[in-house]
Amino acid sequence: MVEQKDKYRPCVGIMLFNRQGHAFIGKRFDSDSYWQMPQGGVDDGEELEQAALRELLEEVGTNKVKVITKSKDWIYYNLPEEVIPICWNGKYSGQKQRWFLMKFCGEDEDIDINYTGHPEFKEWRWQGIDSLVASAISFKKEVYKTVIEEFSSIIKASTISS
């Protein structure tokens, strides 16, 4: 997988968690079965944290967050073969993501998934981190396992100290 790094679209992902230690997930318009955490591409010249905050505002409609940390490494995933020609005109075989852990500092009313007028998600909820993988589409499950493994102890420590 990593031997073709130029075939992976640079992207950021955001694990946004609330005071109870639950993560934000949204149900995409193109699926009735799968939920995902916010993510999106990095624009040319854009810093990774700046991209993560922009994507969060675009997809979740809030900036009431505290950036806690980011993943130590890029996390790669491949798209299914049948999806590659559809996504980004076949330019990429998958995505390489840097994940950011952010604590939500607002109230649920501060979340507006319709913020941009062209939402990514049709609904959203807070979900326990232990069940995030089960809600994800198959080709993102390993990514979610890696992100949870890296961030779960930080989330637990943060919710205890809140």
Swiss-Prot record:
The family database entries (InterPro entries) matched by this protein are listed as: Nudix_hydrolase, NUDIX_hydrolase-like_dom_sf, NUDIX_hydrolase_CS, NUDIX_hydrolase_dom, RppH
GO biological process, alphabetically ordered: nucleoside phosphate metabolic process; ribose phosphate metabolic process
Q: Which CDD domains match?
A: NUDIX_Ap4A_hydrolase_plant_like
* Motif Nudix box per record, residues: 40-61
The alphabetical list of record keywords is:
Hydrolase
Q: Where is the Nudix hydrolase domain?
A: 7-149
Q: What family does the entry list?
A: Belongs to the Nudix hydrolase family. RppH subfamily.
Role played: Accelerates the degradation of transcripts by removing pyrophosphate from the 5'-end of triphosphorylated RNA, leading to a more labile monophosphorylated state that can stimulate subsequent ribonuclease cleavage.
Give the protein name, as stated in the record. Answer: RNA pyrophosphohydrolase
